[in-house]
Amino acid sequence: MIKKTLPVLILLALSGSFSTAVAADKKETQNFYYPETLDLTPLRLHSPESNPWGADFDYATRFQQLDMEALKKDIKDLLTTSQDWWPADYGHYGPFFIRMAWHGAGTYRTYDGRGGASGGQQRFEPLNSWPDNVNLDKARRLLWPVKKKYGSSISWGDLMVLTGNVALESMGFKTLGFAGGREDDWESDLVYWGPDNKPLADNRDKNGKLQKPLAATQMGLIYVNPEGPGGKPDPLASAKDIREAFSRMAMDDEETVALIAGGHTFGKAHGAASPEKCIGAGPDGAPVEEQGLGWKNKCGTGNGKYTITSGLEGAWSTSPTQFTMQYLKNLYKYEWELHKSPAGAYQWKPKKAANIVQDAHDPSVLHPLMMFTTDIALKVDPEYKKITTRFLNDPKAFEQAFARAWFKLTHRDMGPAARYLGNEVPAESFIWQDPLPAADYTMIDGKDIKSLKEQVMDLGIPASELIKTAWASASTFRVTDYRGGNNGARIRLQPEINWEVNEPEKLKKVLASLTSLQREFNKKQSDGKKVSLADLIVLSGNAAIEDAARKAGVELEIPFTPGRTDASQEQTDVASFSVLEPTADGFRNYYSKSRSHISPVESLIDKASQLDLTVPEMTALLGGLRVMDINTNNSSLGVFTDTPGVLDNKFFVNLLDMSTRWSKADKEDTYNGFDRKTGALKWKASSVDLIFSSNPELRAVAEVYASDDARNKFIHDFVKSWNKVMNSDRFDLNNK
């Protein structure tokens, strides 16, 4: 009977979400039996073979051909067409769809760029069965007729966000706009959502700190527990949780208040009865005949007035399908007292509360207003109070703040505006989009490219430093939210210029020389032609690699397309870019134990995953970068060659050479390789290096590149992978 003492959200979770049952004959991955085995699955996710539309499907083109006005009309009609199997509150699905869009986008977090609306991950486990997403399976099912009609022209990710926008607009709110471009995923993402897979487990460590890279305070929540931290109705403590969670999702205090106040202007919460007695398993544990729907409610009709979602019950406003100032007015108009919902959840009602809110399904029945503990937090926290009172006295400022915050919430994970599609994209650019200046000059041509590469190699800069600079600049890219990369040449700006991994003093000298060459070249042009530093950084790295290949007897030319521009410091939010600082980069044999939350080898896989690399691409890149000697601080770890600076396959040849015996060194994460016969020290390595001979899957690839007939193949594979990283952020070439 211990369940009776637990917060309602936990009861909802225990009712069936997060099913962990394993069938007796279920085939498990290697990691199930050997949990210490390195998991390479992140490098094999979302392959083209998973996409039923086919590898050649061009979503951007399909979206651009979409009749957006017809689609929006169909959505608007759907909003007020109540279905008997899931009746609309107040005859309008708008608030329901706002919650769907919000909870799809709200999983985004800044530390690793994971989560967000892109991919439509709310359709898959575990998100589809999170306690905070109870009944959103019905929202998506209500949308299915629209998705069915427009098919490949709009992804689930785009449709859910657009539906949230249309819902707001249909209830009298003017949104800032909408951008398409969220391609759908076809399988669950592999994301670390918390240290414990139990629903609503605390995501804080033993010292009470919210673990990185997490943003939600409890497993299975989008942000925070609406009843208060751990289900305890403490508004001030709740404010602390809100501030931490929202800041990790890229929202400041004003944006946080605008989102909560704006969102809670609409709709109601649902807690008609005890979830323990009424609610079945979530989608992940529901029987097959439920067809992917979960949380079957056996009480009453199971829907309408009997609906159970969060366990809290009631509305914040007497006009829950209209955009009004009532939320803020009610927050300050009444003195609020704690009570419990019919489901037993902690919530707040006005003292001497009058029944003034119409029932969502029977207009003849009236209810009192209510607030969550998280709502009261906006009134009692000193900083939030300043903002809520300002918004209360300036409705226009509130409306504008909500519009901007909503647009940011639903588009933050899409990356730069260059990826946006459609005719509803706002003309205004925002600092959180990492804006870039337009190129107002003529691009360099093939003759210029050849000349600049020759001039770069004559600067006297070691080739390893040119390669290292290009890698440091481009490898900040994250495919999770399309941030970072070389475009903008932000490596010369704060904060990147002073990142430890970039060896600031050396980096500044390289950049000074390249900047001087850039200025000289541009000054000599008479036809409006210019080269950006961003282009020159990549070009110089290419030139150095071509030289390294030439030393190995291989002539090649790395493809190069100019078009990158140089951002200004004013276009670069230092705090926002600080989260991109690597805590580890296995490609440079760099690892900061004090700032990393996973091992060096796991960090390598995570980095490769962020760069959208496959297992062979990661392997080729690391082996090539090692022999070209680009390790941070000129570390000798993994430089398995007697000819550093020559692009060849010696890293793999020497790594797999059985004449070397490896043992741990006294220094942490360092290994010594001794000659088996003489005992002489031959090489030094990190765990990141040795994993390519110890892990069976990585060794299999390493053996290919170590083979006598694979020398040229390795060089060309390295160049192809290098070029992929250098162009990861070139959305003008390939709108991902």
Swiss-Prot record:
Its cofactor is heme b. It is an enzyme of class 1 (oxidoreductase). Heme b binds at residue 264. The record marks 99 as: Transition state stabilizer. Residues 1-23 form the signal peptide. InterPro entries: Catalase_peroxidase (IPR000763), Haem_peroxidase (IPR002016), Haem_peroxidase_sf (IPR010255), Peroxidases_AS (IPR019794), Peroxidases_heam-ligand_BS (IPR019793). The active site is at residue 103. There is a cross-link at residues 223-249 (Tryptophyl-tyrosyl-methioninium (Tyr-Met) (with W-102)). Keywords: Heme, Hydrogen peroxide, Iron, Metal-binding, Oxidoreductase, Periplasm, Peroxidase, Plasmid, Signal. There is a cross-link at residues 102-223 (Tryptophyl-tyrosyl-methioninium (Trp-Tyr) (with M-249)). The keyword Metal-binding applies. GO terms for biological process: cellular response to hydrogen peroxide; hydrogen peroxide catabolic process. It is found in: Periplasm. It catalyses: H2O2 + AH2 = A + 2 H2O; 2 H2O2 = O2 + 2 H2O. Coiled coil: none annotated. This is Catalase-peroxidase 2. The gene is katG2.
